[in-house]
A protein has these predicted regions:
Chain B
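Extreme N-terminal leader/targeting segments of oxidoreductases
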Residues: 2-70, 89
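Conserved flavin/dinucleotide-binding core of flavoenzymes
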Residues: 37-60, 171, 177-179, 183, ...
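N-terminal Rossmann-like FAD-binding beta1-loop-alpha1 element of flavoenzymes
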Residues: 69-96
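Glycine-rich FAD pyrophosphate-binding loop
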Residues: 88-111
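Dinucleotide-binding Rossmann-like beta1-alpha1 core, especially the glycine-rich loop
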Residues: 115-202
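Active-site/ligand-binding neighborhood in enzyme catalytic cores
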Residues: 200, 204-322, 337
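Mid-domain catalytic core of redox enzymes
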Residues: 316-427, 465
């Protein structure tokens, strides 16, 4: 043995140790990611472990086809493990929402890593074997380091790496370790390598790539989280009040406010026709109409189908929202440019404060606020707010309130109904099915009688007499129930809403 | 306040008040708190030091102006303003109110910049039906909007404290309500339950004179000794004697007493302690019995209503420094510290609506040994303007947010009653009675602290619940109240001093202030203002002097 060959085992045994540690870490990362993104951790972990071990078997099997330039191959494999293992978690995070076949890509990457890791140890053993070490000694040393590395990995992973670095950064970190092993071997045995130039080039490339990934992993994560919407994001903006996100898949456009779906262009006509038209059929000569919320202009679009409507006042706090739906071509197509109609007056003001000081009477009021999921919004569903509305509603006028889902949140729904009644309104509850939302409820309210004054417009896609008759029927699982009145000093609706949605979320 | 506080002479007082204004520790902050009520906005805003110096000159100044008025009210806190309010209602217009500070309101003082926020008192529990004068006042001012078929008052829904009203931070989590209920033992929970039911029993208890054992106004309470004897022991002793030993319960009761009286469970008399829990018998058509009325500016809202029709009767920046009877009338020497001129008022009737502790200084010729029993607690109030911040786990941000075993009493969200969805800045009012030592020592300590020191004290406390709050803070203003509240210590409420102090002097000088009740709350100040007005009105209309000219104008 020459001077150099004496060094081989120590360096290479250290490689075994690192390779084993990295290999197990990749397996753990994959398992964690799979259960994190897809749920069902028992199946995911089980499949990942099985697949990974099986792939290692394939790698080991393939190792017999490697006869020459073993050190070159070892470095090559090492670099591949580092690259694939290092980027796996960020790739999986980023593609999670944009591909249908996520799990196949996951399994593919796992198999690839498994195969490479499976090649490493047999290759090393071959190298050592050629260096005239006793077979017993090789087996004993290699497996000792292999299993010690595995133990270290499995302990450090949950205790140190996941809490301190997170999955993406851990992944890059171990990719870099693999690359460092390759670089070390490359440096020490440069003379013995046939493809050293190519390998140097590759090693440096992988090292730089993974290091950049490690440094910018926070950015990758936040970008990846932005893609937790199901479809492609075509617009995103944070207004002073909310995060506005538009997505598109095919021709279907969805609007999210603070991650809550507001509409899907595919079926929003159902929601908005049901919101606007029943109200209008009961309103005697509706000329002046008030919309609270509804900055997307869809309700205005429905209102403009009535020639009698002369003036529409829309109160929406968020100017970014109303401007978007006035200017963006794709969106003005959706609302048929309704917000730019000369009949429409848009006021970006706070609804409660505006109502309190308003002196104008309206023939119809459409209330399209977000669901009462916090105490600020809960105020806009209180008896006090509804009482203020009576000062803004013409004596024969009507109100409609979007009132969350009577199926998902029956108590919340009937609480809105009860609260309207508590300030002297007669109510007419009804609900329709909107596929993107589920079964959705509205409440009509008036101080008068509900008597039909006009027919539904003919060109509607969803609402007509028969559909409306049906919508007034509440099956047993959403039947009316006793609730308290929602007041500013009890905010009971927010409590109902939280309890009911907590059950299904 | 120690005995030494009151034993100095008037001359010494006048001389020393200059120093007091410069930051003396003589416990005269209420008097000198005119501009010295240390409002800090990133720094200690200097007191109007000149007043003290010039006051000494005032005595040697010639009288610049002499005024004749029938009635003079000294002090524009709630009791003084209420007295004026009832004088006006009785058709009396010949009166003036003198206020030392440049603004009115006493403990109902509020701040107003981008937001409105209280500097002290900030809520009124819905009053008992028996408190007729207060109910009438609220109805007259549309805080009671009507009465239902059971004659129960219907309150303005914008004034009833919105839900969620109270939350308590215990071990990393905000629970709903202030009574500790998380992470406590069953035995402790049972004790809390028993304690509360005992308090409820006191709520409905009546004495042998058929009066409520505990009620508001306090003067309507029974004089049955089986209840009044409770004034002879401390609340702590009473609780121990009744086997109420649970630590969370003691914390809670102590918290309540500090909050309402600025005295600890060990200092407060058991009668006063039970009064806190048992005196409120409010009933409403649209509120729970224990609901409270509140506004962004706290009781400043009520104060403005009491004051609104008499603003032209009020003169601010006036220090009344000598009151004496002369030739059948009362002569009041006044120093106008704005114009630095001395004025004299010759009046028929004086309504004294400032704390009793000032009597030895303003009326040194009167015997007033009993004044030593009147002691007052010092407070620090911080108004903190913030951007929205992470409000923590558990119950959502509420009106009153208290940290269990915190250093202060927690904070009130002063913008809680705002209706807007768009609240980009929050206003927190943080309260802390200074009770580590006796009041006099605490006043000494408080006056020398820097803004930085107060700020870090407040932040240290708030960070227990909101570790990152500092990043969101825009401004912290601090105000010190030297004599914020009368202290209902053992024996005070049913002792003799309180009765002595209420006696009018020669039917010419009458007293009105919440300290006469021993409990510093709006209702008591209002009651004393109304009572003293009755006396004065009766003197004016039925007295032997000729008041025919009285309706004036």
């Amino acid at each position: 043995m020459d001077k150099n060959s004496a060094k081989i085992p120590i360096l290479l045994l250290f490689s075994v140790f690192l390779v084993a540690t990295c290999g197990l870490i990749y397996e753990l990362i994959a398992g964690t990611l799979a259960s994190y993104l897809m749920g069902d951790s028992i199946s995911q972990f089980s499949i990942i472990i099985g697949l990974y071990l099986f792939s290692m078997g394939i790698g080991s099997f393939c190792s017999k086809y490697f006869d020459e330039n073993l050190l070159d191959w070892f470095i090559q494999i090492e670099l591949l493990v580092g690259l694939v293992g290092g980027i796996t978690s960020s790739v999986l995070f980023v593609i999670f929402n944009s591909v249908d076949s996520f799990q196949w890509i996951l399994y593919g990457l796992i198999s690839l890593t498994g195969i490479f890791v499976g090649l490493e140890i047999p290759l090393l053993m071959q190298i050592l074997n050629k260096s005239n070490f006793g077979f017993k000694d090789i087996i004993s040393k290699v497996f000792t380091f292999d299993y010690v590395g595995a133990l270290l990995a499995s302990i450090l992973f949950p205790l140190v790496f996941v809490p301190k670095m997170g999955l993406i950064r851990t992944s890059f970190f171990f990719g870099i370790l693999n690359t460092l092993v390759a670089l070390l071997v490359l440096y020490n045995y440069s003379a013995q390598l046939k493809y050293r130039l190519t390998l140097w080039f590759q090693a440096i490339f992988v090292f730089v790539l993974l290091t950049l990934g490690f440094i910018f992993s926070d950015n990758i994560l936040s970008w990846a989280e932005a893609t937790t919407y199901d479809e492609k994001i075509i617009f995103a903006k944070s207004s002073p009040y909310q995060r506005i996100v538009l997505t598109r898949q095919g021709s279907n456009i969805k609007l999210f406010l603070n991650r809550n779906l507001q509409f899907s262009s595919f079926d929003e006509y159902r929601y908005h026709e049901a919101l606007v038209h029943p109200l209008m059929t009961f309103t005697k000569k509706p000329e002046k109409v008030l919309i609270l919320g509804g900055g997307d202009g869809m309700a205005v679009r429905e209102l403009l189908k009535y020639e009698s409507v002369k003036a529409i006042t829309l109160i929406d706090l968020d100017a970014d929202m109303t401007n978007l739906f006035r200017r963006n071509e794709m969106l003005t197509k959706l609302n048929q440019n309704a917000l730019n109609s000369p009949k429409v007056k848009i006021l970006n003001q706070d609804a409660f404060l505006w109502i309190k000081q308003n002196k104008t009477l309206f023939d119809a009021i459409i209330i399209d606020f977000p669901d009462p999921n916090n105490f600020a919004l809960g105020k806009l569903y209180s008896n006090t707010f509804y009482r203020e509305l009576t000062h803004t509603l013409a004596p024969e006028g009507l109100i409609v309130v979007q009132s969350t889902s009577p199926f998902m949140a029956p108590k919340s729904y009937w609480c809105v109904n009860k609260t309207l009644q508590s300030v002297g309104f007669k109510t007419l509850p009804y609900h329709v099915f909107v596929p993107s939302f589920g079964d959705w409820g509205y409440v009509l309210a008036t101080k008068n009688e509900f008597s039909k004054t006009q027919n539904f417009p003919e060109k509607l896609r969803f609402m007509n007499d028969a559909a409306f008759e049906q919508s007034k029927v509440f099956p047993k699982d959403m039947a009316q129930q006793e609730t308290e009145v929602n007041k500013l000093n009890n905010q009971i609706l927010v409590q109902y809403f939280e309890e009911e949605w907590a059950k299904v979320m | 306040m120690g005995k030494s506080d009151v034993s100095i002479s008037r001359k010494e007082f006048l001389e020393l008040s200059g120093i007091a204004l410069l930051g003396s520790t003589l416990g005269l902050q209420t008097l000198t708190s005119c501009e010295s009520a240390t409002v800090i906005q990133g720094q200690i805003v200097g007191a109007n030091h000149a007043i003290g110096h010039l006051l000494r000159k005032a005595i040697s100044l010639p009288i610049h102006q002499s005024h004749q008025t029938k009635i003079l009210i000294v002090g524009s806190g709630i009791s003084g303003l209420t007295a004026g309010y009832f004088l006006q209602k009785a058709g009396i217009k010949d009166y003036e109110i003198l206020e030392l500070e440049s603004h009115i309101g006493g403990n109902s003082t509020f701040g107003e910049d981008e937001a409105r926020y209280p500097w002290a008192a900030h809520y009124l529990p819905i009053p008992s039906p028996e408190n007729k004068e207060l109910i009438d006042f609220l109805a007259e001012n549309k805080i009671i909007t009507g009465f239902d078929e059971n004659k129960l008052p219907v309150y303005d829904e914008y004034a009833l404290c919105f839900h969620p009203d109270e939350r308590l931070f215990v071990k990393g989590f905000w629970q709903e309500g202030l009574i500790p209920n998380m992470d406590i033992l069953d035995g402790e929970k049972n004790q809390i339950g028993e304690f509360l039911s005992k308090m409820n029993a006191f709520k409905t208890a009546k004495g042998n004179d058929q009066k409520w054992a505990f009620t508001i106004p306090l003067a309507y309470s029974s004089s049955d000794t089986s209840f009044t004897d409770l004034d002879k022991i401390s609340m702590k002793t009473w609780m121990e004697r009744n086997a109420f030993t649970a630590k969370p319960l003691h914390w809670y009761v102590n918290y309540c007493l500090l909050d309402d009286y600025g005295t600890s469970i060990a200092e407060t008399s058991a009668w006063a302690g039970i009064h806190y829990f048992a005196s409120r018998k409010g009933k409403a058509a649209n509120a729970k019995d224990d609901d409270v009325l509140t506004w962004s500016e706290g009781n400043g809202f009520l104060m403005k209503l009491v004051a609104k029709n008499q603003l032209n009767h009020i003169k601010t920046q006036r220090l009344a420094y000598q009151i004496e009877e002369k030739n059948g009338k009362v002569s009041v020497d006044v120093y106008d510290w704005k114009t630095e001129k001395r004025e004299n008022y010759t009046v028929e009737q004086v309504i004294w609506a400032v704390p009793q502790m000032l009597r030895p200084y303003l009326m040194p010729q009167q015997k007033s040994d009993f004044i030593k029993d009147f002691t007052y607690s010092p407070w620090m109030v911080a108004n903190i303007q913030t951007k929205p911040f992470d409000t923590g786990r558990g119950q959502a941000l509420s009106w009153d947010n208290v940290i269990y075993e915190g250093n202060g009493l927690g904070y009130v969200l002063s913008n809680h009653q705002e209706l807007s969805q768009d609240q980009q800045t929050w206003q927190l009012t943080y309260y802390k009675p200074l009770v580590d030592n006796n009041p006099a020592d605490e006043r000494k300590k408080a006056i020398v602290k820097t803004h930085e020191e107060w700020k870090s004290e407040v932040l240290t406390d708030l960070k227990k619940a909101h570790p990152k709050i500092e990043e969101s803070i825009l401004k912290i203003d601090i105000k010190l109240w030297g004599h914020a509240m009368i202290r209902p210590t053992i024996g005070f409420i049913h002792g003799s001093a309180r009765y002595e102090a209420q006696k009018s002097l020669n039917n010419k000088i009458h007293f009105a202030h919440s300290d006469l009740s021993g409990v510093s709350i709006f209702e008591e100040a209002f009651y004393h203002g109304a009572e003293v007005a009755k006396k004065v009105i009766s003197n004016i209309y039925h007295g032997d002097t000729d008041y025919t000219n009285f309706h004036g104008e």
